A protein has these predicted regions:
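Short catalytic/metal-binding and nucleic-acid-binding patches
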Residues: 1-193
Length: 193
């Protein structure tokens, strides 16, 4: 079990897939995304991400037919006027969970069910999980209104997240997102229509 502080300053790469990888968000034509009405809903909500919290910067993003990628920067606490650079040395320290006396700081310790539940409750209140929960809920609700399918699950339950710890990784991920429509036919999820 990964124990991270998802409110810590840093850079986060997030991917969220449509349930069963259905191509409902649009299609790629001439290496550009052409949004369906459902894709437009997701695009609109992605662009609202910075409104969710003053520390959030939506650095890069792309919506593809059956998933989206986000590159989100959480600024330093109390720092609201720019993008901070990745500090390779301190990035790991930022994400070590801050309850050093608890089980998650002890290597090879097997947590109890209660301890895992405690961490899960804390995690739900962290910025990134809260943001993703709101994004999934709002887009699903609006898509279901258009489809006349209330309560339908549109997103996979969990999303993939990666804390970026190196400047080189940040640059590679940013370029990957930018070039995703051009490389759509080589994408892992391309053939899962």
């Amino acid at each position: 079990m990964r124990i991270l502080n998802y409110s810590a300053p840093g850079q986060y790469f997030i991917t969220n897939n449509i349930q069963d990888h259905h191509w409902i968000l649009g299609h790629v034509a001439n290496q550009k995304m052409v949004y369906s009405e459902y894709g437009e809903i997701v695009k609109k909500e992605v662009l609202k991400i910075p409104e969710h919290h003053p520390r959030i910067i939506l650095d890069e993003w792309v919506v593809i037919p059956n998933h989206f990628h986000l590159l989100i920067i959480l600024k330093e606490y109390g720092f609201y006027n720019g993008i901070s650079e990745v500090d390779d040395y301190n990035m790991q320290k930022n994400h070590e969970f801050y309850f050093s006396h608890k089980w998650w700081n002890k290597p090879k310790y097997q947590p109890t069910k209660k301890e895992v539940e405690e961490y899960c409750k804390l995690r739900r209140r962290m910025i990134i999980p809260k943001l993703m929960g709101k994004l999934q809920m709002k887009t699903s609700k609006d898509i279901n209104i258009l489809r006349k399918t209330p309560g339908t699950k549109n997103w996979q339950h969990d999303y993939h997240d990666h804390v970026i710890r190196r400047r080189a990784s940040y640059i590679n991920i940013k370029n990957y997102i930018i070039n995703n429509p051009k490389n759509w036919k080589q994408d892992t999820f391309y053939d899962r229509a």
